[in-house]
Amino acid sequence: DLIAFFSSPDLKSWTHLSDFGPMAATGGCWECPDLFPLQTPNGDTRWVLIVSLNPGGIAGGSGTQYFVGQWNGKEFIADDVQTRWIDYGRDNYAGVTFSNAPDNKRIFLGWMSNWDYAAKLPSPIWRGSMTAPRDLQIIEVSNALYLSTLPISELKATHDHSFEISSEVDSTITVGDDEEKIGLSLVGHGAVLFVAGLNYHNWS
């Protein structure tokens, strides 16, 4: 439940500057911190500290919280002690950001898994996937600053090829003496609705 800040003139000799925490969501291991500046809607600069937590996530298991505040070169001072989460789902952990992106964007990429079940995934070599890259921005809501995460605009290029489906397809597959009924409905009108059903031995 602690983030320690160090400085070094040569990346060999290190000097302890300050500690941050514990506060907000605690009770697990704090790891994978990331500290970076972002502009607020009125043009001021605030610093964001991202902290991954395991256990203690909002949805159980591991999760990622963040703090908005000031960095004076030696210590990080949060604006408040409110718990703020990057995600409210279970599958985003240990995320880091990339600087020097086009248009001065701050790009976030996380691990799409959770330590509650990561070791049980049916993959022999890897454990989970990476999240879609997101563009991080600071927004203001009710006089408080929050972190907004949106898919990067470059992902729109993957949506150039689209089509609409406005029909229903139902199929019956017979294997030996057993009958399996599979119903599939695809309806597209601005959005795609996917419905699937299975009836096997009168079970649906």
Name each region found by the language model.
Residues A4-D10, S62-K74, S123-I138:
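Beta-propeller blade signature
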Residues P33-P41, V96-N100:
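Beta-propeller blade termini
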Residues F76-F108, M112-S204:
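Extracellular glycan-recognition regions
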